[in-house]
């Protein structure tokens, strides 16, 4: 069974978001997503200063067996990217909810979080796909 932390919000395309008190939203792919991909060999993230839109493509995760678009759960300006992933994309496999985060966004609208899944809803979504 995939790990699904309870302090995060999720979208159906298997990305997660953690929002800090200052409105910074950290985005990554879920444990389920990295398991489905297999060994990740490349992570593409949006450029610094770019605007990402909730539910829209913002990057890519490529593995030895497939490639998958990465969608942003929230809308906002990209304020940080995880540069470690450029040389060590396998961190996404090893620690998808920690050091394997992909990018950080200055959240444009906290109300957007209301439409995202909590851990229980995401667990049901994953169970339906397994």
Swiss-Prot record:
GO biological process annotation, one example: glycine decarboxylation via glycine cleavage system
Domain of life: Bacteria
Role of this protein: The glycine cleavage system catalyzes the degradation of glycine. The H protein shuttles the methylamine group of glycine from the P protein to the T protein.
UniProt keyword terms in alphabetical order: Lipoyl
Cellular component aspect of the GO annotation: cytosol; glycine cleavage complex
Pfam families, per the entry: GCV_H
SUPFAM superfamilies membership: Single hybrid motif
Record's cofactor remark: Binds 1 lipoyl cofactor covalently.
Designated name of the protein: Glycine cleavage system H protein
Xref: Gene3D superfamilies: 2.40.50.100
Domain Lipoyl-binding: 24-106
Organism this protein belongs to: Marinobacter nauticus (strain ATCC 700491 / DSM 11845 / VT8)
Entry-linked InterPro entries: 2-oxoA_DH_lipoyl-BS (IPR003016), Biotin_lipoyl (IPR000089), GCV_H (IPR002930), GCV_H/Fam206 (IPR033753), GCV_H_sub (IPR017453), Single_hybrid_motif (IPR011053)
PANTHER family membership: GLYCINE CLEAVAGE SYSTEM H PROTEIN, GLYCINE CLEAVAGE SYSTEM H PROTEIN-RELATED
Modification N6-lipoyllysine occurs at: 65
CDD domains for this protein: GCS_H
């Amino acid at each position: 069974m995939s790990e699904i932390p309870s302090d995060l919000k999720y979208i159906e395309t298997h990305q997660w978001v953690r929002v800090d008190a200052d409105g910074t939203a950290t985005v990554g792919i879920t444990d389920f997503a990295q398991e489905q991909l297999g060994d990740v060999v490349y992570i593409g993230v949006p450029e610094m200063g770019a605007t990402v839109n909730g539910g829209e493509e913002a990057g890519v995760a490529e593995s030895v067996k497939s490639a998958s678009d990465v969608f942003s759960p929230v809308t906002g300006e990209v304020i940080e990217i995880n540069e470690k992933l450029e040389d060590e994309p396998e961190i996404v496999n090893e620690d998808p909810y920690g050091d394997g985060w992909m990018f950080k966004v200055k959240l444009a609208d906290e109300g957007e979080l209301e439409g995202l899944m909590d851990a229980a809803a995401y667990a049901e979504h994953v169970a339906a796909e397994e």
